[in-house]
């Protein structure tokens, strides 16, 4: 009786019409190990598995940022006397320029929102416990870099709101001990926000931050692939779904939905240009930074000018910085998670941080004055 043998493989690819090409590619770009790894990779399956998708959403939106940012650079001029006019040109005369600009702005905000959700979901699932401490550290750094992207990009249109909001943000750095004044002068390139400031922010936004972000992102993704995704404390070990095709299919569907939402927001709620910045004009009433910084500016309003002989604003900045540092170092002080236990102190601290961020942000919009 004749027996059928399994088709031979070339570099992990099925034998067939393109076997020769597959073998040629495998000898020059070995991918069989990667393919074999993906075939056996699993994602933990539990009631919070959907939260893993927010990391992929942030990655997708970062890609959108890169593409739309490059397109905007073709027409944008980083000079105080031409920046606003170049934005008007993009929005009014460049074909689909208004759409590209809206997509860039909306995707930036959605990306930071996705990162916040991703960070807190990892926190409450205690997914930072050993050996995944560096995944948490690199992820936290990515959030900080994303917020820095937002801060540097906000000034580039050179509008009234962006000018005075940036002024508030850079003035805050003066309260940092020792290096504060020097940091402010370095950012501004002058005594006040002017042309050199715009040039420096543009360089930071398009030349300095992108390679740093890409390196940290690469490390973050590499660590996730090497160590895998963490099982929640108390979850059933060994219960998972194949990464390919099950999780990839789910993630692809979510990406399509996110791109659809991004398109709807960009078309029906296009990003406004605003009024041109006038350094000699008074600051408009109710000025505030981007939404992901409003918690900081709003909380400083409730601190008295002097507290125990210290500048109230400086004390507020120190308190926010200390809270951020505690949050950043949670994998190293949460000994309960290392023992596979949850503790109310860690959960309570995370809940307080969320309530603080949400409350201060809402107050900034509901009571701007």
Give the role of each language-model region.
Residues 305-306:
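Membrane interface segments of multi-pass transport proteins and intramembrane proteases
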Residues 2-302, 311-369:
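Membrane-embedded alpha-helical bundles that constitute the cytochrome b-like, heme-associated redox core
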């Amino acid at each position: 009786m004749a027996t059928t043998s399994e088709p031979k493989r070339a570099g992990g690819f099925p034998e067939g019409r393109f076997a020769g090409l597959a073998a040629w590619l495998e000898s020059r770009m070995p991918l069989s190990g990667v393919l074999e790894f993906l075939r056996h990779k699993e994602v933990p399956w539990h009631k919070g598995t959907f939260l893993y998708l927010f990391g992929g959403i942030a990655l997708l939106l970062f890609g959108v940022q890169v593409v739309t940012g490059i397109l905007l650079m073709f027409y944008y001029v980083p000079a105080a006397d031409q920046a606003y006019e170049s934005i008007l040109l993009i929005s009014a005369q460049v074909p689909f320029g208004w759409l590209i600009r809206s997509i860039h702005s909306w995707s930036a905000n959605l990306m930071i929102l996705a990162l916040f959700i991703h960070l807190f979901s990892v926190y409450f699932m205690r997914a930072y416990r050993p050996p995944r401490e560096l995944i948490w550290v690199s992820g936290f750094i990515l959030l900080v870099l994303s917020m820095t992207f937002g801060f540097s990009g906000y000034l580039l249109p050179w509008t009234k709101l962006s000018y005075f909001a940036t002024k508030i943000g850079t003035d805050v750095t003066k309260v940092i001990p020792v290096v504060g004044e020097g940091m402010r002068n370095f950012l501004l390139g002058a005594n006040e926000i002017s042309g050199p400031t715009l040039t420096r922010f543009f360089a930071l936004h398009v030349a300095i931050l992108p390679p740093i972000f890409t390196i940290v992102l690469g490390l973050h993704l590499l660590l996730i692939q090497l160590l895998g995704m963490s099982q929640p404390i108390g979850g059933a070990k060994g219960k998972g779904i194949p990464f390919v095709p099950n999780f990839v299919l789910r993630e692809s569907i979510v990406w399509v939905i996110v791109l659809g939402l991004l398109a709807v927001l960009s078309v029906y709620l296009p990003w406004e240009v605003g009024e041109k910045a006038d350094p000699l004009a008074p600051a408009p009433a109710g000025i505030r930074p981007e939404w992901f910084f409003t918690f900081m500016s709003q909380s400083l309003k409730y601190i008295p000018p002097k507290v125990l002989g210290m500048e109230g604003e400086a004390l507020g900045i120190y308190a926010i910085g200390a809270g951020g540092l505690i949050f950043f170092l949670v994998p190293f002080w949460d000994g309960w998670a290392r023992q596979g236990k949850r503790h109310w102190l860690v959960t309570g601290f995370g809940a307080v941080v969320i309530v603080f961020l949400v409350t201060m942000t809402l107050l900034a919009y509901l009571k701007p004055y």
